């Protein structure tokens, strides 16, 4: 709560300390209401004027707005003072009894309002609901009031003394209402036909209902109607527990008729609000008018509205967030109601949801037992549940179970038949395509994202599927981007249903459908398809604002070295593409000059702009990174020629270092024994069969051993792990075949094997993490940095003989100092990793600026980017979007006022972190280019590989 002193107010005689305390309590209550509204994502700002003080309460943004408008505060204070001067000053009390009575009435009114607010909160709404004091006192178990002072019973505030009222307001945060059994009698329907008028309210006992909330507002500019005091109430329908009606009862002083303006907000009706006849851009809430029985029928004409003093209610743009929150609460109730309906249907033996008779279950305890409800949550209709209770129910959905003990009175379960979906008349609506990414395929709603189909064209089912599975990733697409994504997903569905030929090259559809018998070559359609893809690739490359290349080589079955060139580019919309650019056979020398000439020729074929080349990723061989004649050196020279001042970044593949670092362990004495014994067992069929039988007889956890190959690095860790866990069986089998291995009985050798098992498993985990699809270079760099930190931790633990992260070594350890023997090996691994990451450390500041733009220090940013980065870090809107979507999606929302920073981010996003994509291509090549089809032309192989990738 902010308090602002205004000097323009006349200083009157100071009030008593008790009066000021009362004002403080009331403002505190107003602040509590603002906090509750803020939970519904509503922005509120309130200004209260008392004597010479101005109190500002509300949400954080609301208070910031009012505090920034000091002129608005002063004008409001002057207005309040001017209005007060016009009124007749009441005579001073003769004694202090009248003042004391006035303070008591104010406190009593505040307590009564807070009780109404707590009761409304217990009903699941944020508005104040009149408290049925008489019914609560008659049936004290129906509603429990917690937090009252010890020895003080709940009753109407008019029965409390001044001290009790003050205590309640001071400790109101701990007071809450818990509804165990709702009041469902017809006479208790709030806002029903029996609602009294203002004249009648004056003679009704205060225990019947909470008084109206008086709100003073400025008159509207376009009408002479001023909004007077409004009485807000909530009417609960007995038949449908998910239906609420919010009534605003007019209390115009000059009105003698009982006219009610009733706003209906059904919890399940999804029909959009009907706009008024008067054109207005803002959406309008539907207004239902109820008049006297003696009054004439009300029309929609302007005259009718004028006669009844009805104020049109509009929903401004700044209330969209509040309406969104109401919609979420509505959906939450629908989900709970659907859950209860499905569980009740299962209880009565049907496979579809059945409407739950909440009233019959409540008033007939023992007929239906509900198990699995969260602790402290009582079963009741979703309309009576709090938001937190509904969320807990959904979390425990799989544990909730309905059991019918005996039939419910008046409910014939035998009449519940099979569900006839075809008679429900449901029709798929076109707007669901854009809202939930669903289309109708042969009268069946099908999800465009996961291709899952729904049995019924029901919006709730489609919305629940979308929000449960896809909203996290697809809510970010708005307006035009959402339409483009919908079009893209539709094309993907067509490809999924009809095959890829219609999508990739529609002009060749007949060629694939009806191949000509006169075709001379069976591979001609493949070349035509690839030709179409080459043209698309050229068009895509022209749209790149930055790109990088990755180069690696392999020897195929014909003993020919194949050089693979991949390109990774980013367009102006920050869409990333990775494509195979070319495969070049290296038949001559493999020098840097020869490789450069082949790469240059391939880049010219696609008319690539050298000035947009950002980096090159390679394996780090001398032909690639030689300082004089290496490929990277010549590429840097060429880029500098086309773009002065530009520097080509060179990245050595960081997937291979772990296999190279393994050589630094120098544990060949372990690997040689393992490889020799495993290959001897697995390479001979008889040995392998007998060994498998032995493992089966010994009831071992493995039925065989893995064959070790030096080509596959991952096989080393798997072989070592299985070898260690089958050590006794292998020793017994080798001894029975006359090939004993004395190392298998050596404690030191077994301990070295255990350390190697743990270390290779750690390296394998790193390798798998680095091989993720389409990883950003910053993510891969973070993984390597994390592994370096782990190495430092392991070294520290080994000095203390802490083997917590070496479980296999811990099993084989027999001495408290066994861990000290492997500290030098960990240190060698650290040195090797740091050496191979030296390239990344050169660009560490640029990578950090991309991955953490809002926490980067300005001093570490390049001078040409500093101004834009400062503007970005001070932009709270973009900071919120960054926290919500993260990178790289955040950069799609970056505004055009950051051109230099956007270009910097595009360059970082285009960088390859490794040549793993080349290794994927080589795997495809080994599977495709066998000795049976190795005679195809190079152009034909390019087409096959390009389609495969």
Curated annotation (Swiss-Prot):
Q: In which broad location class does this protein mainly occur, judging by the first location in its UniProt entry?
A: nucleus
**Among its keywords, does the record have Transcription?**
yes
SUPFAM superfamilies recorded: GTF2I-like repeat, Ribonuclease H-like
Q: Cross-referenced Gene3D superfamilies, in alphabetical order?
A: GTF2I-like
Query: Which Pfam families does the entry mention?
Result: GTF2I
Where does the UniProt annotation locate this protein?
Answer: Nucleus
Query: In which tissues does this protein get expressed?
Result: Ubiquitous.
Q: Which UniProt keywords apply?
A: DNA-binding, Nucleus, Repeat, Transcription, Transcription regulation, Williams-Beuren syndrome
The domain of life is Eukaryota
For this record, the Gene Ontology CC terms, alphabetical, are:
nucleus
GTF2I-like repeat ranges are: 98-192, 323-417
Q: Name one GO molecular function term.
A: DNA binding
Regarding protein family, the annotation reads: Belongs to the TFII-I family.
Which disease appears in this protein's record?
GTF2IRD2 is located in the Williams-Beuren syndrome (WBS) critical region. WBS results from a hemizygous deletion of several genes on chromosome 7q11.23, thought to arise as a consequence of unequal crossing over between highly homologous low-copy repeat sequences flanking the deleted region.
Q: What is this protein called?
A: General transcription factor II-I repeat domain-containing protein 2A
